[in-house]
Regions:
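Helix N-cap/capping motif at the beta->alpha junctions
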Residues: 444-453, 474
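Conserved acidic carboxylate
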Residues: 421
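Short amphipathic alpha-helix used as the core "switch/output" element in two-component signaling
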Residues: 437, 453, 475-488, 507
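PLP-dependent amino-acid enzyme catalytic core
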Residues: 1-408
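Charged docking surfaces used in two-component/phosphorelay signaling
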Residues: 428-436, 506
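Active-site beta3 strand of CheY-like receiver
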Residues: 458-464
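Hydrophobic/aromatic residues positioned on beta-strands within the core alpha/beta folds
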Residues: 495-496, 518
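Receiver (REC) domain active-site loop signature in two-component systems and cognate sites
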Residues: 469
Length: 535
């Protein structure tokens, strides 16, 4: 495969296909094939399918993040779950196609530089294909990932320096040994592989939401991805361009490229109006897998996409990414690596800034799994030990008095919170937020009359109150609380779906400590208010 144009020597080449022929095959043959990335083989740069190196990559699920969507006020928030890939990251798509091309070219030994996930994927697939691999890794890559790479038999070279410095050392090694070097973003196979993610999303959305008005497949309004070198976002964008060329979709999405603040050359350069990215020479981030200081040719391409079609370049702090990790795991059961969480943190930020509309269809690439969990993400108090063995090694007898005393002590140190909410989904969400963030005794009522009876029987430390309820609404509940000496000092957080008038806000004065708009707060926002009130 050529590495540069024979006429102009440009080393950023692109693939063009017979789209008319592929369009016919898409209708006639693609649907009969297994749902994986090789379903779209006519749009991939492998001439002979027998050279394919596959381990079941692609065909990952697309599902709705129901709880987080409710929390953010988004009706159509979907997660593309690339954690299901053979090595746990979307880079398996890249490895499968790139190693297939190497096999077709007769390459038996190759070199790459990586911040972690690419090296893991390439190590697995090169071993599967019988190709020897050398991986040059910057020293910031966690030791766990380096050991996993070595487990596959890859020669691991740890470079004391940045990722860009590791790439230079790798290139020097290639020159001295005459080996094949994976060119990253400039590799045709690497970029083309990421198209398959976009193809799958369009098919899956059509199944979930129905086809577009003028085309058989469906397009999201926004596609979110954490970017380092930008290859994934570029590949997905090309997928939508090709589908539009073939009449499979009738519009294009907006791309949201999210980076960490400590290494955000694309975001910084875009907001400064630069046409070429200004490199970050010394990345300062714990999210090492997306610490490319110099994104090269990907930035001008993505910049032109955003300027022409809309979209965003957004940066988030490491802490915002770790916060998003906790929110996604505790609210929707989705555990992910920090790099994936960067994309979700970017979504949270854009929602809070009013850039995303409630009816927008959102796809977030959950690009990889977090296993093992990095120690710094949980801190020191993530577990509690319980001794159950007696002197002889058997379990001690539990006396009723001791057990009751323990339960009483538990009640004494656990705050009681009452939820009054008639919408069952909203009540479930509030309960889930509380359960995920701390130890609380939770009482729940679904109308104002029932709620007042509940708090009179067991006065809580705090009330989470919806205003629009049957029987007695939230305003009536507030009036009743104020009139009862036992209840008038209980703090209240009002969670409402509508904007309140000035007179309505006056009715809430005194007892209400905070007013939260449904769909505009994160779980951590409400927990900060709860912690402040209870402390």
């Amino acid at each position: 495969m050529r590495s540069e144009c024979p006429e102009c020597s440009n080393d950023l080449l692109d693939m063009v296909y017979d789209y008319e022929s592929v369009r016919w095959k898409w209708d006639a043959e693609f649907a009969k094939r297994p749902f994986n990335m090789w379903r779209y083989r006519e749009l991939l740069p492998v001439r002979d399918i027998s050279n394919r190196v596959t381990m079941g990559e692609g065909g990952t699920s697309l599902f709705r993040a129901h709880n987080v969507g409710m929390m953010l006020g988004l009706r159509h928030l979907y997660v593309k779950d690339e954690r299901q890939s053979p090595t746990g990251s979307f880079k398996d798509r890249q490895a499968s196609l790139a190693i297939s091309v190497l096999r077709e070219m007769g390459v038996t030994e190759a070199v790459l530089a990586s911040t972690g996930n690419v090296a893991i994927s390439y190590s697995a697939y090169s071993t599967h294909a019988g190709i020897k691999l050398w991986a040059f890794l910057p020293s910031m890559v966690p030791g766990e990932k380096m050991r996993e790479i070595a487990l596959y038999g890859t020669e691991v070279i740890k470079v004391t320096g940045t990722y860009d410095q590791a790439k230079q050392v790798a290139r020097d090694f290639v020159v001295s040994r005459g080996l094949h070097y994976d060119r990253g973003f400039k590799s045709i196979a690497a970029r083309e592989s990421m198209k398959t993610l976009g193809f799958e999303v369009a098919e899956q959305l059509a199944d979930l939401l129905g086809p577009s008005e003028k085309a058989p497949l469906q397009v999201p309004d926004w596609y979110f991805q954490a970017v380092s070198g930008g290859m994934g976002a570029v590949g997905v964008w090309k997928a939508f361009l090709e589908m539009k060329e073939m009449g499979l979709v009738d519009r294009l999405p907006k791309l949201a490229s999210i980076q960490v603040s400590g290494c955000a050359p694309m975001v910084n350069s875009f907001h400064r109006g630069l046409e070429v990215a200004e490199p970050v020479l010394n990345p300062q981030t714990l999210v090492s897998t997306i610490s490319t200081g110099n994104p090269g040719a990907a930035y001008p391409y993505l910049r032109s996409v955003v300027l022409e079609h809309g979209g965003a370049f957004v940066k988030v702090a490491d802490e915002e990414a770790f916060r998003a990790m906790h929110v996604m795991a505790k609210m929707d059961g989705i555990s992910m690596e920090p790099a994936s969480a960067v994309a979700f943190a970017g979504l949270f930020k854009m929602v809070s800034q009013g850039q995303i509309q409630p009816d927008d269809v959102i796809i977030v690439n959950c690009s990889g799994h977090t296993f093992p969990v990095e120690k710094f993400l949980l801190g020191d108090d993530w577990e509690r030990s319980v001794e159950v063995a007696g002197e002889s090694g058997t379990a001690p007898e539990l006396h009723e008095e001791g057990l009751l005393a323990s339960l009483e002590n538990l009640d004494q140190r656990t705050n009681r919170i009452a939820i009054m909410e008639d919408n069952l989904d909203s009540a479930r969400l509030l309960r889930r937020v509380l359960q995920a963030q701390g130890e609380y005794q939770i009482d729940e009522a679904h109308d104002g009359r029932e709620g007042l009876e509940m708090v009179r029987k067991n006065p809580p430390d705090l009330i989470l109150l919806d205003l629009m309820m049957p029987e007695v609404d939230g305003f009536g509940v507030i009036d009743a609380l104020k009139a009862d000496e036992r209840l008038q000092d209980i703090p209240v957080i009002v969670v409402t779906a509508q904007e309140l008038t000035t007179s309505e806000k006056r009715r809430l004065d005194g007892q209400v400590h905070r007013l939260l708009q449904k769909g505009t707060f994160l779980s951590t926002d409400i927990m900060e208010d709860i912690d402040d009130i209870l402390s």
